[in-house]
């Protein structure tokens, strides 16, 4: 089911709860792992929790039991703030960098198949390539630091241990 296309889903007759149970089976199969997203804290993780709740399934499946969350959108934003040349971005009318995957992909990886933009598989490929680019750039220290805060426990330990801890917040296109 994962990345097999919308056609397969349309031709099946799964109910919402059957689909959610199947998704939870995949989560169990792949766990424990670090669930990595682009804007997951703003969309993916929230959606999964709400739909799991509606289906009477465990709502924190992807961040308990050894699982952790990582959202690379804030990592990319922080990297661009401190190392402006690490990613090529277009600029919005309000003079802010644009961090949409279907914009970042072609700007940074011209060989991407543009016919697949904003599909699950293309978003995954673009996310992976952005992560690799950040890891291999001057922003690698931000990339590495992001891995230290993928769980509540590790984030708390890091914050309590360090004398200085920096985080970046993003509001309406501004850091």
Which residues does each predicted region cover?
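Extended hydrophobic/Leu-rich segments
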Residues: 1, 22-23, 120, 159-161
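Short, basic/hydrophobic alpha-helical segments
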Residues: 16-32
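Metal-dependent phosphoesterase core characteristic of DEDDh/y 3'-5' exonuclease domains
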Residues: 1-6, 11, 27-140, 145-149
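Acidic two-metal-ion nuclease catalytic site recognized across multiple nuclease folds
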Residues: 132-175
């Amino acid at each position: 089911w994962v990345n097999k296309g919308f056609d397969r889903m349309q031709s099946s007759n799964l109910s919402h709860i059957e689909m959610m149970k199947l998704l939870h089976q995949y989560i169990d199969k792949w766990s424990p792992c670090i669930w990595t997203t682009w804007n997951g804290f703003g969309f993916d993780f929230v959606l999964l929790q709400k739909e799991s709740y509606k289906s009477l399934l465990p709502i924190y499946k992807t961040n308990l039991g050894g699982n952790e969350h990582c959202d690379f959108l804030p990592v990319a934003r922080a990297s661009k703030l401190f190392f402006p040349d690490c990613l090529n971005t277009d600029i919005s009318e309000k003079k802010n960098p644009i961090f949409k995957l279907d914009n970042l992909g072609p700007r940074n990886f011209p060989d991407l198949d543009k016919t697949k933009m904003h599909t699950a598989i293309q978003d995954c490929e673009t996310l992976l390539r952005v992560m690799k680019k950040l890891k291999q750039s001057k922003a690698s220290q931000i990339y590495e630091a992001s891995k230290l805060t993928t769980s509540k426990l590790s984030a708390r330990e890091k914050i309590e241990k360090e004398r200085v801890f920096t985080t970046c917040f993003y509001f309406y296109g501004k850091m």
